[in-house]
Amino acid sequence: MSTEHTNTPRADSPQSAAEAVRGARQHAPAATPAESDPILELAEAMEGPLRIPAHTPEAVRDTVASLEKRLIGGQREFRRREVASEAGVSLHSARKLWRAIGFPELSDDEVFFTEADKKALGTMVGMVREGALTEETAISLMRSVGQMTDRMVVWQIEALVEDMIANQNLSDRQARRQLFSLLPEIIPAIEDLLLYSWRRQLNSAVHRMALRVETGVAAYNQDRGEDDGGTPLPLARAVGFADLVSYTSLSRRMNERTLAQLVQRFEAKCAEIISVGGGRLVKTIGDEVLYVAETPQAGAQIALSLSRELAKDELFPQTRGAVVWGRLLSRLGDIYGPTVNMAARLTSLAEPGTVLTDAITANTLRNDARFVLTAQEITAVRGFGDIQPYELSAGEGAGLVID
C-alpha cells in the first residue's frame, strides 16, 4: 500500500467525521464560532490521536499527559519510519503489525512512538526472524492481544464509571472526570491481575491441550465409530448455548441503563455457572452465551444449571438452551463446525425453560442417572435435514452447586 498522501479526495471516498461536521455547519447557523465548536473539535480529535479538544480543562490535560507517559512507557519521540528502520523491517510490515494491535493510521511526520513501542516491534520481528513464528502468526497474535485488551479496557472503564455513579452520586460526566484521578492509584493492581489471569488461563489451556484432548477425542470416536485420521475438526467438546427468550421485545421496553444492567447480570451469572461446571465461556452476544465443556456430562450439567439458576432470577425473562457433543475447530478465540451449528439450531427450537440435545449426545448420556432424556418430534432442521431432538432434564443428584 502506498504511503503517499494527496489533498484531492476521490469522488467515491467517504467523508471524514470532521469534513462531515464542517459540511453540516455550512448549511446551519453556527451557535459558536467555528474555532471553538466542541463537536468539530471532537471529530478532529478522533481523527488525530495526539489531539485534545481545546475546551478540555487544563487540569484534565495535565492528568492525561501524566497518565500517558506512565502507560505508554515514556515520551513520544519517534516517527513510524524511524521505528520500522531500527527494527530492520519495511514500513509495510511494521504497519501490518501495528494495525493488528489497533494503532490508528499515521502520517510519516507524526511523532507517535516511544522506546517501549520500539522494543515491542523488535520483539515480534525477532521471533519471526528466529523462526519461532511466521509473519502471519505474529500478526494473529498481535490481533488477539489488541482486540481482547481493547474490549477489556472499555469494560473496566465502564464498570468503574458505573460504580462511581451508583455509589458516589455523580453524573456520568463527573464520574469520568473523577476517574482520571483514580486510575493512577489502581493501574499497578490491575496490571498485576492481568498478568496473573493470563498466566492462569494459559496454564488451563495447556492442561486442556496436553492432558484431556486425547481423552475427549477417543470418547467421541468410540461413541460415533470413527477414527482420528486426518479430520479437519480436531477437538471433541460439548458445545452449549443459553438464550434469553423475547429479548428483542423486552429491550424495547427498557431504558438504556436497565437494559445494560440486565445484560451485565446475565453475562456474569452465566460466566459463574460455566466456570463452576469446568467449562469455558467462548463469547456473549447480548441475549445469548456460547460455551464449551470437555465432556458431554459436564456440558449437560452446565446446560441444566444455567436453565435452573437463570429461572430463579426475577430480572430475567425465560431462557432456553441446547448442548451437543461433537467435533469442532477453534480459531481466533471462537469455535466453528457442524456441532456449533447444531447447538444453535436446537436452541432456536427449544421451548422456553427447556434444554434440547441431539440423538447422539442423548445416547451418550442415557445411562447416566443424573440426566433424563425425552424424545421430541422429528424436526426438519436447516442444514441437517430431519433430526430427532431430545429434551434434557435433571435426574438424580443435586447438579452443580452454585453459591
From Swiss-Prot:
Q: How is its activity regulated?
A: Pyruvate-stimulated.
Enzyme Commission code(s) on record: 4.6.1.1
Tell me the enzyme class: lyase
Bias type Polar residues, positions: 1-16
**Which Gene Ontology BP terms does the record give?**
cAMP biosynthetic process; intracellular signal transduction
Cystine pairs annotated here are: none
Cofactors named for this entry:
Mg(2+)
Q: Which Pfam families match?
A: Ad_Cy_reg (PF16701), Guanylate_cyc (PF00211)
Query: GO molecular function of the protein, one example?
Result: metal ion binding
Q: Which domain of life is it from?
A: Bacteria
What is the cofactor note?
Binds 1 Mg(2+) ion per subunit.
Which catalysed reactions does the entry list for this protein? ATP = 3',5'-cyclic AMP + diphosphate
This protein's major location comes to cytoplasm
Positions bound to Mg(2+): D243, D287
Q: Where is this region: Pyruvate binding?
A: 31-60
Looking up Gene3D superfamilies in the UniProt record yields:
Nucleotide cyclase
* Region described as Disordered: spans on this chain: 1-37
What UniProt keywords apply to this chain's record, in alphabetical order? ATP-binding, cAMP biosynthesis, Cytoplasm, Lyase, Magnesium, Metal-binding, Nucleotide-binding
The record's subcellular location field reads: Cytoplasm
Family the UniProt entry places it in: Belongs to the adenylyl cyclase class-3 family.
Q: How does it assemble?
A: Homodimer.
Q: What does this protein do?
A: Plays essential roles in regulation of cellular metabolism by catalyzing the synthesis of a second messenger, cAMP.
Q: What is this protein called?
A: Adenylate cyclase
